[in-house]
């Protein structure tokens, strides 16, 4: 899931030229790349990933059958040398690379793929990645004609099937190290909670460069756990880390002025920031608040009362656009351009609230029972743009008599609340979309899904509109015509705009910071923006990370 104070963020010290190792015309193999995670990884099991930190590790360590190139947006052979999908979209056959081994030396063959797919689709596992493959009732069928081939048949057609395998890291069926045995360019060598994750070069990795030299070039990647974005940019400027995958907008502008070669804006991203209300029936807060949150008019009024243009202008310094739905306008084909763009209108918000029994009394909004409208929004600690957005939303909603409190939590605690204990009222977070095909959002929109955040894991849809989204999601996932899929997805976006389960705020630009010492970088609009091609990254001949004197 992965996926970001009402004062302008300031640095503790004045910006100056970054103390970064100078890149040479040709890099060298070896060395250790340094960058930061913004929290603890929640899991090392690639099938259970739902947070950005764990996704970073999955991307760098997981071997996949098919890789979606973040720059060309083309599908490339991975562990599979070739594949073929049946005309009805239900069956896919993979021809696997022979002679490969996991990082611990365990041989790789079709049994590992079969084992992974069975685990992925096991309903007891509740895999967010597995949700993307659920297109119909019934079980998948798997055949392994040989050690180097596998045939997977789904109960119904799966649209965009090939692209989905970019998210499926293959597990070993036999290694005693279980999910820690990997087929990607790096493996997890060390983890100190609260400090760092160390990845080392997988010497069994199958890829080679054009000259036949084994990849990756790097010896290791150190991922320091750093929640505070201010400290992260200071460490980048001192040369202690080599890149920042997602850079805050105001820090981007300052870095661009001081070191243009290190600041990269790849343009509008697919990512979104949004707020939602907890509608889980068993949540431990008063029933009258649950009634507010379940009321469509209440959610729509909140949406009307938030000034998205100000969020884009002030928080993101113009490096973002107001968002009104689940698909970014940067995703040209799938974006529904007919969606209404609700403009900031506090008077209209009050009229809408009055229709469902709320009254504005002496500058305070009360419900029909006289309860003051007040709620708490949780967000991730150390993420200044999110903290600043909550602070600005506090100001906006105070104009219609609503009191908003803010609580910031470290990321593991926040994830625990929104996925396990449901001990919260509202949350501001974001989703990172790694691919263009919206089928990757199945784990958000199906009412039974893990990331259906406002009310996850429903045994049956709680509302008629959620049932309709379920039907449309299943229909588009089974359709073989892009025209039919587009029509279904347009309708899903329309329902989301009408019901506002997520109140979308902004789509930000893909901004990153990359040291000139990093050779081979090619920032992408798709995540991971700065290290999608980590296997071919090199460091300049000066590998020192010390600050300049």
Segment roles from a protein language model:
Residues 25, 95, 129-175, 190-192:
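Surface-exposed binding/hinge segments that line
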Residues 34, 109-116, 147-153, 185, ...:
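Alpha-helical secondary-structure segments
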Residues 36-87, 118:
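N-terminal lobe/hinge region of extracytoplasmic solute-binding protein
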Residues 69-71, 163-222, 230-231, 335, ...:
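Gly/Pro-rich hinge or "lid" segments in bacterial periplasmic/extracellular proteins
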Residues 81-126, 151, 232-235, 291-294:
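Aromatic- and charge-enriched surface segment that lines or borders ligand/interaction sites
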Residues 120-123, 127, 141-143, 189-200, ...:
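Extracellular/periplasmic solute-recognition and catalytic clefts
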Residues 192-196, 265-273, 301-341, 345-350, ...:
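Detector for C-terminal structural segments
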Residues 205-254, 394, 403-405, 410:
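Ligand-site clamp/hinge motif
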């Amino acid at each position: 899931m992965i996926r970001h104070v009402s004062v302008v963020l300031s640095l503790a010290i004045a910006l100056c030229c970054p103390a970064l190792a100078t890149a040479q015309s040709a890099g060298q193999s070896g060395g250790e790349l340094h960058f930061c995670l913004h929290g603890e990884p929640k899991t090392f099991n690639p099938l259970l990933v739902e947070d950005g930190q764990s996704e970073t590790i999955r991307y760098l360590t997981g071997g996949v059958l098919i890789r979606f190139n973040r720059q060309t947006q083309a599908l490339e052979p991975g562990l599979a040398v070739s594949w073929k999908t049946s005309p009805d979209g239900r069956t896919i056959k993979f021809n696997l690379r022979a002679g490969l081994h996991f990082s611990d030396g365990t041989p790789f063959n079709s049994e590992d793929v079969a084992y992974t797919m069975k685990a992925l689709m096991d309903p007891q596992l509740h895999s967010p990645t597995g949700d993307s493959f659920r297109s119909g009732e019934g079980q998948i069928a798997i055949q392994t004609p040989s050690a180097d081939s596998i045939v997977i048949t789904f109960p119904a057609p799966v649209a965009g099937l090939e692209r989905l395998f970019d998210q499926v890291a293959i597990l070993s069926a036999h290694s005693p190290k279980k999910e820690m045995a990997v087929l990607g360019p790096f493996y997890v060598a060390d983890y100190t909670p609260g400090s760092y994750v160390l990845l080392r070069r997988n010497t069994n990795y199958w890829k080679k460069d054009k000259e036949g030299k084994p990849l990756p070039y790097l010896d290791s990647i150190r991922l320091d756990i750093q929640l505070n974005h201010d400290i992260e940019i200071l460490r980048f400027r001192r040369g202690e880390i080599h890149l920042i995958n997602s850079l805050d907008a105001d820090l981007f502008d300052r870095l661009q002025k001081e070191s243009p070669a290190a600041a990269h804006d790849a343009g509008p991203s697919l990512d979104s920031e949004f707020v939602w209300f907890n509608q889980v029936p068993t949540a431990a807060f008063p029933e009258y608040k649950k009634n507010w949150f379940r009321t469509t008019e209440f959610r729509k009024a909140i949406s009307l009362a938030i000034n998205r243009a100000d969020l884009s202008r002030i928080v993101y310094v113009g490096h973002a656009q107001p968002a009104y739905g689940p698909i970014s306008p940067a995703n040209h084909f799938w974006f529904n351009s007919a969606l209404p763009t609700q403009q900031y209108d506090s008077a209209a918000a009050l009229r809408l609230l009055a229709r469902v029994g709320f009254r504005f009394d002496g500058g305070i909004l009360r419900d029909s029972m006289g309860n003051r409208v007040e709620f708490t929004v949780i967000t991730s600690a150390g993420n200044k743009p999110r903290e600043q957005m909550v602070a600005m939303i506090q100001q906006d909603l105070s104009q219609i008599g609503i009191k908003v409190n803010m609580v910031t939590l470290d990321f593991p605690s926040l994830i625990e609340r929104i996925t396990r204990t449901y001990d919260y009222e509202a949350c501001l977070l974001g989703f990172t979309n790694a691919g263009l095909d919206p089928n990757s959002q199945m784990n958000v929109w199906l009412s039974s899904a893990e990331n259906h955040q406002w009310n996850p894991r429903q045994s049956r849809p709680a509302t008629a509109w959620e049932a309709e989204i379920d039907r449309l999601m299943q229909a588009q996932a089974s359709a073989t015509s892009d025209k039919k899929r587009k029509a279904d997805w347009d309708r899903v976006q329309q329902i989301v705009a009408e019901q506002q389960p997520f109140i979308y705020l902004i789509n930000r630009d893909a901004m990153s910071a990359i040291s000139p010492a990093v050779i081979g970088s090619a920032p992408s609009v798709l995540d991971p923006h700065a290290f999608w091609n980590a296997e071919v990254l090199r460091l300049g001949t000066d590998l020192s990370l010390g600050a300049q004197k």
